[in-house]
A protein has these predicted regions:
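Entry beta-strands of beta-propeller and related beta-repeat scaffolds
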Residues: 1-3, 43-47, 99-101, 146-150, ...
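Short, solvent-exposed loop/turn segments at conserved positions within beta-propeller repeat blades
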Residues: 7-9, 51-55, 105-107, 157-162
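Repeated scaffold domains used in trafficking and secretory/extracellular systems
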Residues: 32-38, 134-139, 186-191, 226-235
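Solenoidal tandem-repeat scaffolds enriched in leucines and small polar residues
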Residues: 54, 64-112, 122
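Loop/turn-rich, solvent-exposed surfaces of beta-rich toroidal or solenoidal domains
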Residues: 153, 179-210
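Blade-level signature of beta-propeller repeat domains, shared across WD40, Kelch, NHL, RCC1
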Residues: 231-254
Length: 254
């Protein structure tokens, strides 16, 4: 089965199976706009959306997507005016070992974490570009409960190398920013290569497709092709999507 989540209002969530497609959630609020959806296992899934009354919208399922419910106002992260989740690549959510992370951008760029299936949250400021609607964290990935990376920048100035990434080795409590010399500009999506011990990553941007073999501190270009989103099927198979194209790459370790 798979799920489809529309953007705009009304926000519609469909569950598709061989037997057919079913609408499982509908949000008619005039400000409803959902940005990212992720399943943490075959039962628990989460979707997050732009703030309403200063609160991030958080939608969850506990039965494999058959039914969905919003977290209450007090259970959702409070966002600053102009702060939101970006919908660039459906990678603003990460989940490892029962811990959940969501990144934001805009007027402020932060990472929110939860260890109780999105009932309560902690927040940490990120050292990424921020202060404008086009700036912030666009993508987050964790290899394990300690090692993670956030990437983004300014999508209107994709060549700007300042404030485009940061790395953590303590589960997101602290973040070390990438220097401009070690960046390649705005990033829409970053993923760890499975079974790489957290050393190998792939990232995509308007500047091309890049890879790292040292946890994300240094990058080399794989291709000048422009992609917006990435997904590893396994450690040897990477799917990349862009404007009117989907490519499959075979990852060869050396």
């Amino acid at each position: 089965r798979f799920f489809m989540l529309s953007i705009g209002t009304p926000a519609l969530l469909y569950r598709a199976e061989p037997s057919g497609m079913t609408e499982v959630f509908r949000d008619d609020h005039p400000l409803a706009f959902y940005d990212s959806m992720h399943f943490l296992n075959d039962q628990f899934g989460i979707a997050v959306g732009d703030p309403i009354d200063s609160r991030m919208q958080v939608l969850v399922t506990h039965n494999g997507g058959k039914t969905w419910a919003k977290r209450t106002w007090s259970q959702t992260p409070k966002l600053a005016e102009g702060e939101a989740v970006f919908a660039a690549s459906n990678s603003a959510i990460a989940y490892i070992d029962k811990k959940l992370w969501v990144v934001t951008g805009g007027s402020a760029s932060r990472i929110f974490s939860s260890e109780d299936q999105a009932h309560s949250w902690r927040e940490v400021a990120l050292p990424l570009a921020q202060g404008a609607p086009t700036k912030g964290a666009f993508s987050v990935a964790f290899y394990d409960s300690k090692h993670g990376i956030v990437m983004g920048g300014n999508y209107e100035q994709p060549a700007d190398r300042n404030g485009t990434g940061a790395i953590t080795d303590d589960g997101g409590k602290t973040w070390q920013p990438l220097t401009a010399d070690n960046s390649f500009g705005y990033v829409s999506c970053v993923k760890y290569v499975p079974n790489s011990k957290g050393y190998a990553l792939v990232a995509c941007s308007p500047n091309g497709l890049y890879y790292s073999t040292d946890r994300g501190y240094h990058w080399q270009r794989l291709s000048a092709e422009v992609y917006h989103a990435l997904l590893f099927i396994d450690e040897q198979t990477l799917i990349a999507s862009g404007d009117e194209k989907i490519s499959i790459f075979r990852v060869v370790s050396r």
